[in-house]
């Protein structure tokens, strides 16, 4: 065997095979060095490399890691609606992994933001599965294009931090398929992540790590996943059951490989199943071999910082811009002919930025430039007052007084507000959507002293805006912007670039408007997903709920017009949408064209509309472009629990094209043939179901003809009786028609048996 060739599982002993199915320590695979299988490193995280300085000892220190580029977490990056940019972020992350000899980076996380109080919302992409999947795939493809693996997580239904290690998420098959699976499914089918990390929680009574239906039936057999499945850290509670379910790798190791050996010897695990799981680990090592063999590689720190800078720019969402208060005029620095505005900067976040979330994804950045640092570097003058401390302690009157005095003497005030890290992190959920009260009070005091206030928010998940929005002419939602957030904010605030971010999550007026609150965060060890598929805007828009800001919303310094929307069928249940978008302003900027599909009459309750396509277009002043978005069959389908499959009903569908879920420019319609699925009819099928079925309709017609001929009793023809009739299983016809009803039911069953042979 050559040194460059890894063995087949056939070359290993039983004990060696078993050893491959658990880690070597908290951050390494367990290799078999004697057989040429190295124990490569795997480590966090979703928005940049977090390689612990103590990793070699198997310890975990979330605040002590090698310097790496801190890109915007998913809460910000998702607002870019720019998969190409996200792909560049993935490529840069991979290059840093190569330098640090990390074979697999643990991310991205594509769990749905079921409830905005989720403590880990900063690390996830969206309330919408289509957007989450079509953005996060950029990380997977970008990283793996460089020969480094990703770990798509947390599969599945890890949608809260409360009791996350054991809570039983009780979810309907339809909600799983339409909301909680699609981001995973899309990335698996299109990008084949090299690893997937299962979640801690149970799904309908079974822990994810021991869930054969989840890890094998759905993930591998149905979706065609080719990689390995690892546990979240400490999520494997039964080595044998997990391996049988389809878990390749226990992390971190529990040093119980002998349990696998004994289970194979006594027949609880078949040799073939162990071989499959162990061979998957060998295949993973093979995939990463080339990249891990590169020595003395050094990534370009400045180039990666520029990628982080661009990512931060496109993450910023402008929520309000009354009186065109933005962009600000920095004077000769930005415009040689302009007089500078006197600027006050208030808020500790401007000096001490909150640029990432807390927990396992915490990164030590290669650089860190605050907004105040950026102003100094660019020669832009501003008076600063911290106003408050970055904790949950009561307000400091001296800091408040200083801030108000600073505001009085300014032409415009930039107030940097938001959530301190103590308010949201991995490990716990939030209990309110509000900003800390001391910050709202300070804003009111400052607005009373100066009407020209722009609020710049720093937060990992949405916060309510309506209670204090009247005190600000401008609002920028900047999320957590990574290490280059300061320069990015300056670029947007002073007009070097127009904001182009769009919300990936609705901002509700009140947390109690969210439909999941009736089952949040659960009770007695379980949480019921009673809202079903009506998550986020699917609920708010369907039921006409007022919101602070709708899904997909975001303002620009430019203005745009969408015209010429047209749809053309490309198949029985597929279509293509074309639209022209025009920049009608004198500002170069980007706009995101969003396509929503609205079903017509359906057999099940469906959301008013759902995002099924988008594209981001950069347009110079006055420029127009035509965009094309393809809609596949899944764009029109829902998961039918009756058929246990995706189902497209025949009929007319509305295609809405706009710039948010509530800003629809034009609507067109397309008529689809449907997939023709039918379910066998029985005596328990209603008369209405018989009428709607192709075979059943012929039999219903035969019943009517036989009634006219006197061969069968005639059915009632008045509207009220027909209503009762249509809702009745045909075996109940005797209750309506007596003995004649029994004859009709038997006739229908007999005729169906003939037609369906």
From Swiss-Prot:
Recorded effect of pH on activity: Optimum pH is between 5.5 and 6.
GO molecular function ontology, one term from the record: hydrolase activity, hydrolyzing O-glycosyl compounds
The protein's name: Exo-alpha-(1->6)-L-arabinopyranosidase
Keywords: Carbohydrate metabolism, Hydrolase
Pfam family membership, one: Glyco_hydro_3
UniProt GO BP: carbohydrate metabolic process
Catalytic residue list: 232
